[in-house]
Amino acid sequence: MTVPIIFGISSTKLTKEEIDLFSEHKAAGFILFSRNIESKKQLLELTSVLKGLYPERKIPIFVDQEGGRIARIKPPIGARLYPSAEHFSNIYNEDRLRAKRELKANYIQLMSELKEFGIDSPCAPVCDLSFAGASDVIGDRSFGNTPEKVVDLCKSAISGIQHSGGLPFIKHIPGHGRAFVDSHFDLPVVDTSLEELEATDFKVFGELIGEKVWAMTAHIVYSSIDPLLPATISKRVVDYIRNNIGFKGKLVSDDLCMYALHGEIGKKRSTLKKVIELAQSNLVWREDYSKSLMELFDINTHQITNLEIIELCKKKLAESKTEFLESLAKVTRMSLDAGCDLALHCSGDIDEMRTICNVNVK
């Protein structure tokens, strides 16, 4: 049975559990991350194995390779580090034609390299506007702060990707730039009027709908359309994307593991994972999280070591997994029922993958 899911996998090669799962539930595609890449030879072998799972059809393979800080393939595996969108935005301010020419050439080379590795899409370009004071989750990934500039540069990026036989992926429809929190961890709410959104953020995507691209949704509440649900799981917003913005191509959810979609259990797991990461570093972090940890553990975390905190957090994560799996099944169903053609699941966690494979869609 084919499932409408693009999956991440756990490591540099498929495990037996993954092979068994993907044999029973045929994936719509795969997405790779740094954890899946250790050498040129290994990467080629992995993409060959993934494509060989379903010889009867073409299986697309994706990777986040926008350029700048979003690059899963780095030298010496990749030929070079590619510039960020902001780099071309700055050139554009001085010389529009040069920026467009260099951006297209950049994506021709980037996509050509990905094709050599058996990868079909860089999950680019980012089409979100930049806004002062917004979360830096977009930041230098944006081509600029005006619709005209962003559309102009995105068309060059799309042309470069297509020139090398790649699949452009415009994101994050209908616009992520105004988010003041990172949707990997929290749920952004945009209260901007529909009239203003249509003249700015939404306009960008409306101008790009004829470019033969796929699109990735934003995990953001747009209160002027649906005050309750983020775009990915909102039928109102997906209908708006289809009927008002006019996008008729493949619509893919952003990663369903992102905690913006999961309410209180998402906030809890987000905090636990951030604390584990910080406790493993040399950064000063306890003051920022002492209240949250007191609520989670009912202890004064200043009195225990980082190692003890890490173990406590790992235990809480394990205890909360069943609740998270229930939430994951729910949002998977909601995203597909809302009108997303495909859902993206990136973690590579086998229990999560089994859960969403068994979701019944209306």
Which residues are covered by each model-predicted region?
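Extreme N-terminal starter segment of soluble prokaryotic enzymes
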Residues: 1-5
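Second-shell residues forming the walls of enzyme active-site clefts
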Residues: 7-8, 14, 35-55, 59, ...
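Short beta-strand/turn micro-motifs at beta-sheet edges
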Residues: 17-19
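Catalytic domains of carbohydrate-active enzymes, especially glycoside hydrolases
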Residues: 21-33, 117-118
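Glycine-rich anion/phosphate-binding loops
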Residues: 39-45, 92-112, 147-152, 197-198
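Glycine-rich, aromatic-flanked loop segments that form ligand/cofactor-binding clefts
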Residues: 51-81, 106-130, 150, 158-174
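A charged helix-plus-loop insertion that forms the helical arch/lid used to bind
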Residues: 77-97, 142-144
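Short glycine/serine-rich loop/turn segments
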Residues: 121-144, 172-191
